[in-house]
C-alpha cells in the first residue's frame, strides 16, 4: 500500500442454503428458526367470505391434493385433516365467543 491511501475493510457474508419442506401449520416456526427472529402478528378482525381466490369455494382447494403415486393418487394425512375440519369461518365464530 502506498502512504496516504486508506481502504475500507471488506465485508464478507457467508450464505448457507437450506432446502426445507414443511406444512402450512409449521411454516411460521420454520421461518423463525432459520432467521432467528420472532414474528409479530397483529390482532385484527378476521372475516371469512366462504369464497377463495377467483370466487371459488375455498373448501374445494384442499380436496384432491396428494402425492402422485405409481398407481394413482395417494392421499396424505394432511389432506384428511382438512376434509374433516369445519370451515374456517365456523372455527373463528367458536373461538371468538369465548
From Swiss-Prot:
This protein's record includes keyword Cell cycle: no
Alphabetical list of Pfam families matching this protein: VQ
Record InterPro entries: VQ, VQ_1/10
Spans traversing the lipid bilayer: none
Record localization: Nucleus
Principal cellular location given in the protein's record: nucleus
Keyword field: Nucleus
Residue span of motif VQ: 27-36
Protein's UniProt name: VQ motif-containing protein 1
